[in-house]
């Protein structure tokens, strides 16, 4: 290598290597301090794009899980209310069976019928007043649509819970009658004599079947939502793990990189200092 004064190639090379080691040291320190392997797009452009898409999915699925849990709550509220109505109908049936007995006097049947009417009105109030977040559950013609996925695919990411309008259910309506609208009126079905009581028994049996069918539907919906939540939790876990492998810093590897960069930094500083002294050797030639 020729000896020159104006251009110190050895020093330039040492400075370039020192700059590289400084950059490596800065990168290692940034990753260790932030906990992230990718702190900007320049660190891993493709990886950042993939990780951000995964992050979008994870956030969407997290919200979808909350939506599904709302569905579970709605089904629980609806099923609980129907359970209460079912108990009221069972008591009404007991009263009808008791009233159908020929040993009852007219005053006995009037007393039985008064309780029967009160229970009918309470059943109507419960059915009409059961709400979830202000929305009627058992007295609505509008299906409840739940967003249970992170995307907009209607077949995969949405679940429709079919509306239940008890007022339109002939089996239940035949028991409650005119109390459907007000909750305080006199029901069409009464137990003031044996024939009416026997008719009431048959009508209530049919109404109880309708109540139980809808309770079973709510139970099935609840189970489905629970499975959706469980599957979503697994998906979130896997997506988060995949994103972590791209974005998160490996502390063992980064600590090793930091130590290496520190050593190179110290060695580079020493070599630059020595390289800057090389032009001084030209003076020995001039003195000769």
Feature-to-residue mapping (PLM):
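Primary detection of the long, small/polar-rich alpha-helical "axial" segments characteristic
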Residues: 1-288
């Amino acid at each position: 290598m020729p000896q020159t004064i104006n251009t110190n190639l050895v020093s330039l090379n040492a400075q370039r290597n020192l700059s590289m080691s400084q950059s490596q040291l800065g990168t290692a320190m940034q990753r260790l301090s932030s906990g992230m392997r990718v702190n900007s797009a320049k660190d891993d452009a493709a990886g950042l794009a993939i990780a951000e898409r995964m992050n979008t999915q994870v956030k969407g699925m997290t919200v979808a899980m909350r939506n599904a849990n709302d569905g579970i709550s709605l089904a629980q509220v609806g099923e609980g209310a129907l359970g209460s109505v079912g108990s009221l109908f069972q008591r009404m049936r007991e009263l009808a069976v008791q009233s159908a007995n020929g040993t009852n006097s007219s005053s006995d049947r009037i007393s039985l019928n008064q309780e029967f009417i009160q229970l009918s009105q309470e059943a109507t109030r419960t059915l009409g007043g059961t709400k979830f977040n202000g929305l009627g559950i058992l007295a609505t013609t509008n299906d409840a649509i739940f967003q249970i996925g992170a995307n907009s695919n209607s077949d995969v990411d949405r679940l429709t819970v079919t509306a239940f309008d008890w007022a339109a259910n002939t089996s239940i309506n035949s028991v409650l009658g005119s109390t459907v609208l007000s909750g305080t009126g006199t029901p069409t079905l009464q137990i003031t004599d044996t024939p009416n009581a026997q008719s009431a028994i048959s009508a209530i049996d049919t109404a109880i079947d309708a109540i139980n069918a809808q309770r079973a539907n709510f139970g099935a919906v609840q189970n489905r939502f629970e499975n959706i939540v469980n599957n979503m939790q697994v998906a979130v876990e896997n997506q988060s793990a995949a994103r972590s492998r791209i974005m998160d810093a490996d502390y063992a590897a980064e600590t090793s990189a930091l130590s290496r960069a520190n050593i190179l930094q110290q060695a580079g500083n020493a070599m630059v200092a020595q390289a800057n002294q090389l032009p001084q050797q030209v003076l020995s030639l001039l003195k000769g």
